[in-house]
Structures are given as structure tokens and as C-alpha cells.
Swiss-Prot record:
Organism in which the protein naturally occurs: Salmonella agona (strain SL483)
This protein's pathway: Cofactor degradation; L-ascorbate degradation; D-xylulose 5-phosphate from L-ascorbate: step 4/4
Record gene name: ulaF
HAMAP family from the UniProt entry: UlaF
Similarity comment text for this entry: Belongs to the aldolase class II family. AraD/FucA subfamily.
Record protein name field: L-ribulose-5-phosphate 4-epimerase UlaF
């Protein structure tokens, strides 16, 4: 597990590097599906002092199997996503400013241009509000459930992120690095959408044919963007 712990540590350290977190407001995890184990950031440990061996290993029930700290308080959300979506290898949660602003507004991040379409096939959805019972019950698990409910039958790697109503963004990917990459992009397109809507409040979404072209040239069966 040491290699995966290093990957998760590096991915967590990318959060302050890319300006996605303040203090300890964020966490990254990754899964070893063969072993059924997840590596995740410890709860409340400052990035400035965090080390590789501080990463916590949990099983799919959230039981700690390795590590001296408690795992992230959002662990149950991460586990719910891994259990529902076999294609996910990494999950990240932040409170990055612009993506969180859309979450607090209770609005999806609209697909307005090609930067968005290069990564997200359509709007980045916003979940419904959790009920008082859901919050007072198994809050973090119910957060995972409302994400799953909102995504429905969408392929999660085609919509690799979401904003949870009045909470903040979650993103995911093939591995921890990919999840952080998508979280960075989500914050950037959230900022772009906010600026663009300020310039032109009547702005229309990106045309479907342009969105399809940009997404499929990177992610479709005949993708040709980048190097093989």
C-alpha cells in the first residue's frame, strides 16, 4: 500500500498548491480495488505538517486497517462513490471558492464554453438539499447517496464532479491525480461561468455540436487529442 499512500499524499498536497483549500478544508482518497482498501487523508491534520505515513487506510466499511489517525470525516462519502461506481479510482472534496459559491447558490455550474466541454459533458450538477433527517442521521453517507441520486445513470467519468447544495464540490477520476485535475478544472470553469454571466446575464449555454466535438475529441472512442 505504500505506493498508493504516496500517490494519495502527493494528490492531497496538490490541493494547497493549486489554491483549492484553506487550512484543512479538503481531502483526497484513492482505492485499491483488488484489496478492497481505500487510502485517505487523516481528519484535521494540517498540510504543512502532514507526511506520507499519516495517510489512513480503511476497508470498504470504513474500518481503519492502517494508520495512527482518524480518517477524514468525509470518508463515508468517498466509500459510497467507490461502491457505486467501479470506474472511479480517486475522489476529492474541497471548498474551493467559486465552485463552493455555486453550491451555496444551489445552482449547477453551466456549460458555457469549450474549456468546460473539454472535461465535463454538460452542466456540472448541483444536488438537492439534504433533509434534516439526512443531516442528523448518517450525514456523510447521505451526502454520498444524494450525489449518486443526482447523477442517476450518467457515466461518472463523463461528469467527473458535482456541487453538493450549500456544501461544496466533489470531483473524481481514474486515480487520485486525475481526481485533483478535475477538481482544479471545476474551480476554473466555475470562476469562468461566474465572470461570463456577470458580463452577459443572458448568455446561452455552449452549442451542443461544439460541446460534443470538444468532449469527444478528448474522451470519445475516436479521441485524437494529445499523444498516444
Amino acid at each position: 500500500m505504500q505506493k498508493l499512500k504516496q500517490q494519495v499524499f502527493d494528490a492531497n498536497m496538490d490541493l494547497p498548491r493549486y489554491g483549492l483549500v484553506t487550512f484543512t478544508w479538503g481531502n483526497v482518497s484513492a482505492i485499491d480495488r483488488e484489496r478492497g482498501l481505500v487510502v485517505i487523508k487523516p481528519s484535521g491534520v494540517a498540510y504543512e505538517t502532514m507526511k506520507v505515513d499519516d495517510m489512513v487506510v480503511v476497508d470498504m466499511d470504513g474500518k481503519v486497517v492502517e494508520g495512527r489517525y482518524r480518517p477524514s470525516s468525509d470518508t463515508a462519502t468517498h466509500l459510497a462513490l467507490y461502491q457505486r461506481y467501479p470506474s472511479l479510482g480517486g475522489v476529492v472534496h474541497t471548498h474551493s471558492t467559486h465552485a463552493t459559491a455555486w453550491a451555496q447558490a444551489g445552482m449547477a455550474i453551466p456549460a458555457l464554453g469549450t474549456t468546460h466541454a473539454d472535461y465535463f459533458f454538460g452542466d456540472i450538477p448541483c444536488t438537492r438539499a439534504l433533509s434534516e433527517e439526512e443531516v442528523q442521521g448518517e450525514y456523510e453517507l447521505n451526502t454520498g447517496k444524494v450525489i449518486i441520486e443526482t447523477l442517476g445513470e450518467v457515466e461518472p467519468l463523463h461528469t467527473p464532479g458535482i456541487v453538493v447544495y450549500q456544501h461544496g464540490p466533489f470531483a473524481w477520476g481514474k486515480d487520485a491525480h486525475d481526481a485533483v485535475h478535475n477538481a482544479v478544472v471545476m474551480e476554473e470553469v466555475a470562476k469562468m461561468a461566474w465572470i461570463a454571466r456577470g458580463i452577459n446575464p443572458a448568455l446561452n449555454p455552449i452549442d451542443d455540436y461544439l460541446m460534443n466535438k470538444h468532449f469527444m475529441r478528448k474522451h470519445g472512442p475516436n479521441a485524437y487529442y494529445g499523444q498516444k
